[in-house]
């Protein structure tokens, strides 16, 4: 197959037979259609386009658009960006103030930058522009109603139909769902959730004197509800102030944000934006594909369960989804497509899945003993060094716990249950799951 041998050769379709090529051109069958132009979707579109495939990126909003997000860019996020990407930092963090529900405040500092802070509209827009420069085509203001893998809209078993609001149908050899935590593509795949949290956030413009006090420093406050915490992220003349806690604690979460803002002395400043957002974390056995459809980022429930950090998970899973979508687009039958989808699941679970597994244990331990976490980060150099290494990208939470006996013992003492992989069970179980995902292709709506 010349297309497989030369991934830089852009073709109308992954199938190079003359008859199919002419038909594809007439019906405009895309190699890869990506739904959602956030960090996960833009990364997937970039990865597929840079491989020479014909890629369409769909986004329901007009860009740029606001997203509820702290906007912290840690090392793993930076390392997953396209070559030449210049981060639009609003601030660079060298100090962290920790507090335990407003008490026992202590600030720790680092000579090297810990992480950077961005505004999502700028960041997302730049990611999309990189995907476009790589060859992806963007359509905004379109809403996907459903995807179909058989039926009258689908010309053959190698094609997926993406049905838009209004009835237009787009055909593709592979589809990547990156349409966020309320994903319609996720519903089609059958994504199952294990943890749902509510994040509330306010963008608060402040005078220059207040902004100067926060420059280069963030605040992390361990909250009053189990597993909750708050943050202040400075971005020039605006402070991003937010809190997050388990869903079902809506009134208490709102009260926490109000108390938090009041304690900070910011109650007198009017927010320019107040917003809320649900973060959703996948169950261990949640599928990552169905037929020729993959999911990534929030649509797949991929985020770090303890901190609920999602940007690095979106960028990394999006890149993998784009790379494996290219292989699925090239697959000539269901068996090969199934094999490629299974490989994508293995790639996700071997990396991000391990981090999620450790993150779940960290969250359980944090829910029980937030004061101990606070004491460690503010009083023990190894704990602070671990925080620095993770945020700077020198290691990950999974690598840290698995590679350092002291960290293993500490986590085992806090959470004595045996470690479970985030869906990294026996290969036989995964193969069976992949077969079910592939063989039950069809239509789902939400």
Task: Pin down the residues of each PLM region.
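C-terminal helical "tail/cap" subdomain of flavin- and related membrane-associated enzymes
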Residues: 326-430, 435-446
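A conserved beta-strand/loop capping segment in the N-terminal third of enzymes
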Residues: 77-126
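Conserved N-terminal glycine-rich FAD pyrophosphate-binding loop of Rossmann-like flavoproteins
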Residues: 61-84
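Glycine-rich FAD pyrophosphate-binding loop
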Residues: 33, 37, 46-69
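FAD/FMN-dependent oxidoreductases across multiple families
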Residues: 146, 169, 248-324, 330, ...
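Beta1/beta-strand and adjacent pyrophosphate-binding region of the FAD-binding site
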Residues: 24-40
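Predominantly flavin-linked oxidoreductase catalytic cores and closely associated redox partners
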Residues: 51, 130-271, 301
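Intrinsically disordered, low-complexity terminal tails and inter-domain linkers enriched
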Residues: 1-27, 150-157, 331-334, 420-444
């Amino acid at each position: 197959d010349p297309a497989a041998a030369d991934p830089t050769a852009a073709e109308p379709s992954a199938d190079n037979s003359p008859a199919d090529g002419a038909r594809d051109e007439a019906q405009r069958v895309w190699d890869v259609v990506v739904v959602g132009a956030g960090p996960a979707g833009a990364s997937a579109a970039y990865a597929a386009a840079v491989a020479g495939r014909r890629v369409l990126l769909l986004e329901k909003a007009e860009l740029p658009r606001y997203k509820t997000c702290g906007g912290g860019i840690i090392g793993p996020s930076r390392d997953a960006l396209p070559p030449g990407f210049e981060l639009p930092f609003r601030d660079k963090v060298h100090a962290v103030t920790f507090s335990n529900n407003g008490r026992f405040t202590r600030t720790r500092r680092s000579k090297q930058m810990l992480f950077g802070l961005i505004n999502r509209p700028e960041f997302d827009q730049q990611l999309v522009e990189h995907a476009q420069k790589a060859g992806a085509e963007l359509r905004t203001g379109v809403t996907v109603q459903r995807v179909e893998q058989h039926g009258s809209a689908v010309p053959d078993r190698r094609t997926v139909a993406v049905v838009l609001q209004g009835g237009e149908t787009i055909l593709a050899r592979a589809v990547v769902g990156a349409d966020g935590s309320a994903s319609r593509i996720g519903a089609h795949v059958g994504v199952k959730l294990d943890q749902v949290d509510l994040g509330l956030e306010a963008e608060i413009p402040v005078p220059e004197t207040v902004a100067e006090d926060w420059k280069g420093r963030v605040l992390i406050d361990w909250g009053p509800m189990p597993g909750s915490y708050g943050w202040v992220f400075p971005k020039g003349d605006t402070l991003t102030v937010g809190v997050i806690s388990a869903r079902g604690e809506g009134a208490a979460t709102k009260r926490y944000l109000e108390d938090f803002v009041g304690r900070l002395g910011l109650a007198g400043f009017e927010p320019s934006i107040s917003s809320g957002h649900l973060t959703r974390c996948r169950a261990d056995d949640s599928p990552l594909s169905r037929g020729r459809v993959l999911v990534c980022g929030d649509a797949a429930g991929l985020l770090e369960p303890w901190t609920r950090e999602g940007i690095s998970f979106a960028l990394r899973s999006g890149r993998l989804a784009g790379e494996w979508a290219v292989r699925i687009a090239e697959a000539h039958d269901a068996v090969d497509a199934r094999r490629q989808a299974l490989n994508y699941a293995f790639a996700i679970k071997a990396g991000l899945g391990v981090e999620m597994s450790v993150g779940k244990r960290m969250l359980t331990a944090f829910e029980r003993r937030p004061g101990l976490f606070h004491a460690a980060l503010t009083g023990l150099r190894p704990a602070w060094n671990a925080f620095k290494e993770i945020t700077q990208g020198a290691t990950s939470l999974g690598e840290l716990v698995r590679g350092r006996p002291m960290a293993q013992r500490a986590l085992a003492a806090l959470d004595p249950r045996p470690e479970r992989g985030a869906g990294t069970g026996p290969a036989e179980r995964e193969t069976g799951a992949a077969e079910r995902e592939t063989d039950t292709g069809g239509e789902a709506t939400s």
